[in-house]
Amino acid sequence: GCRRCVSLCTAFPTLFDLVDESSTMEVDGVDKKDYWKVVDKCYLCDMCYLSKCPYVPPHEWNVDFPHLMMRGKAIKFKKGESKVRDKLLSSTDFMGKTLAKPVISNVVNTSNKNKIFRNLLDSTFKVHQHRDLPDYSAYTFRGKNINTKSITDPISPSTVPSKVVLFTTCYVNYNEPIIGEDFLKILNKNNIQHELLNSEVCCGMPKFELGDLESVEKLAMKNLPLLSKYANEGYAIISLVPSCTLMFKQEIPLLFADNQEFKKIAQQFYDPFSYLLALNKESLLSLDFKNDLGNISYHVPCHLRVQNIGLKTKELLELIPGTTVKTIERCSGHDGTWGIKTEFFKDSMKIGKPVFKAAEQFNPDYISSDCAIASRHIVQGVRENSKKNIEKL
């Protein structure tokens, strides 16, 4: 093959080494037991499909490597070969509801910074001792902000919906509520009518990446009536995590291809910066920025690139006077729960190294990413302070 994908991650070098060392020097010569080495190293970033492989549809070979790997993960999960650790780490609602509480969150956060505890966690649970883990909040975003105030004089754009409903996401709800609170400030500042869902569950991306498709279906069906109501009423549905947006815009409609409600929901899902830029084109976005941001090294997450909407975040940040944005369009290497695991931590840091170097070379005042987890990972790699894009606005 062309091997254009070899530099993207460690799955492809593993695959090509197995092929080159086989008796036939083709895939048919690789021991099928070794297939799992490739499957486990794929974290479903979709970059090979989007940017490298020349054989994707409509080519007659119809190569879709990410979804092929996902099927492998689904087989492994169905056979009961997935680890307890992976099942627990992908249960983001359970983890959040258990740990994002007063006192408990403080104990967990303190423990996660304790070397003795992290050594124990590494040796028993295989969560790498050197991985910086996100803190859990003492309160949830939804619990504090569910009763959002109504807008007295809401705007009426013509190109995008005038009303917004926020899909909170597990990370914003349990780990960094400040991201959601900053976005609410933006909505209020710009007189955008908005609501929070009365209830929601995880989008299902962590379970999808594990191959637990039954759990993905259960989560999707719980979210369906909630999101369908707002989609049918013409709301823009906005998620503050690119992976969650991608799940609803791409993966769920593919999994449930006959469900028209999921297709309608996908049509109403917006990236936050894409939505705000649309308002700006109608001169409905406040540009009353009080501070310049100087130089920003901005990392474009894989799951945002896959959405093919362009560099909306960069465009919007550059509306701020005195702000220059340098984009980094490479995988950061963290990739959900994958980079947390002991066996993949070194690969995670290796994949991220070009991103770390590129971020530093710009001599930035800020290092930023739409993906909060990627942002933390890059900060760990370059040891710089970082702020999320939403905070900047």
Give the role of each language-model region.
Residues 2, 6, 39-50, 200, ...:
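Residues immediately within or flanking Cys/His clusters that coordinate Zn2+
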Residues 6-41, 55-85, 390-393:
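Non-heme iron-sulfur electron-transfer modules
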Residues 8, 51, 247-248:
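Residues that scaffold the ATP/ADP-binding catalytic core of kinase and kinase-like folds
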Residues 20, 25-27, 46-47, 161, ...:
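Active-site-adjacent bridging/hinge elements
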Residues 38, 43, 58, 170-174, ...:
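Short, charged/polar micro-motifs that form catalytic or ligand-binding hotspots
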Residues 49, 54-55, 91:
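N-terminal low-complexity, Ser/Thr- and acidic-residue-enriched intrinsically disordered segments
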Residues 63-393:
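Iron-sulfur cluster-binding electron-transfer modules in prokaryotic oxidoreductases
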